[in-house]
Design a protein with these regions (language model features):
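Short beta-strand scaffold positions
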Residues: 67-68, 139, 160-161
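Active-site-proximal alpha-helix that buttresses catalytic centers in soluble enzyme cores
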Residues: 3, 20-90
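Phosphate-handling substructures
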Residues: 40, 82-142, 195, 202-207, ...
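Short active-site segment of divalent metal-dependent hydrolases/proteases
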Residues: 25, 165-166
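Generic structural signal for well-ordered alpha-helical scaffold segments
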Residues: 50-57, 138, 142-150, 170
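Short, hydrophobic/glycine-enriched beta-strand segments
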Residues: 16-22, 159
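Acidic, low-complexity terminal tails and accessory targeting/binding regions
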Residues: 1-16, 61, 90, 97-108, ...
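Active-site signature of alpha/beta-hydrolase-fold catalytic machinery across serine-
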Residues: 79, 168-172
Length: 221
């Protein structure tokens, strides 16, 4: 074995990505808004955004706050960015799922469709009519997480996105089959920190809405 072959490569520094779902909106739990423009946070959502910004503001070392380009995510990301002294960076990879012709429909109506059972029980084989498939959503989010974690390594970053997109990231990180990802719950303004290192991702918490978020993080960060 040559000296070059025997030399160990230094381990990559881990990047902590703190995933945050946007706050409550007037359509939360009632309508599938998708990528429809003009949806803003409700007063409840604004309060949630300020609250999570206060929690994350206690974390030392956050260098970047990314956001999906949707209004509701930007309005959630802005207080967080202000609390740590940075600007919001829009990242289209974090955008809401494209629900196609289901966009804007009432959830109560969608639950009556035969396709709804597949969305809940076999999402890996489902594509929203004229929209994305769940496999495409998962692939897009995995690519986005890789890009964020590499730019640069060893930092703490916040990524504000949406329920289903965040759920696919958590499922991938845990090695959970996509057909089981609906068992994951992501509440408005909940926090799910994931450590991306040189080996497998390490999920520190899922759907956390408590004040002691900083205690979940590795002491070395």
């Amino acid at each position: 074995m040559s000296k070059e072959q025997g030399t160990k490569r230094p381990a990559k520094k881990a990047t902590l990505v703190v995933l945050v779902r946007h706050g409550h909106t007037p359509t939360t739990g009632r309508i599938l808004p998708g990528r429809a423009k003009g949806l803003h946070l409700s007063p409840t959502g604004e309060s949630q955004a300020k609250k999570v910004a206060g929690f994350l503001g206690d974390i030392k070392g956050i260098t970047t706050v990314y956001s999906s380009p949707m209004e509701r995510t930007i309005e959630t990301a802005k207080p967080i960015a202000d609390s740590v002294g940075v600007k919001v960076r829009r990242n289209r990879g974090l955008i809401e799922a494209d629900f196609g012709t289901w966009t804007g429909r009432k959830l109560s109506d969608l639950r009556k469709l035969a396709d709804w059972k597949q969305v809940q029980n076999n999402p890996s084989g489902f594509r929203f009519p004229s929209g994305e498939s769940f496999l495409e959503i998962q692939s897009r989010m995995s690519k986005t997480m890789t890009e964020i974690a590499e730019e640069p390594r060893g930092e703490i970053v916040v990524a504000v996105s949406h329920a289903d997109t965040i759920k696919t990231v958590i499922a991938t990180a845990l090695g959970t089959p996509l057909d089981l990802f609906q068992r994951i719950n992501i509440s408005p303004c909940s926090v799910s920190p994931i450590l991306f290192g040189s080996s497998s991702p390490y999920v520190l918490a899922v759907n956390s809405t408590g004040a002691d978020i900083a205690s979940l993080l590795p002491k070395s960060m």
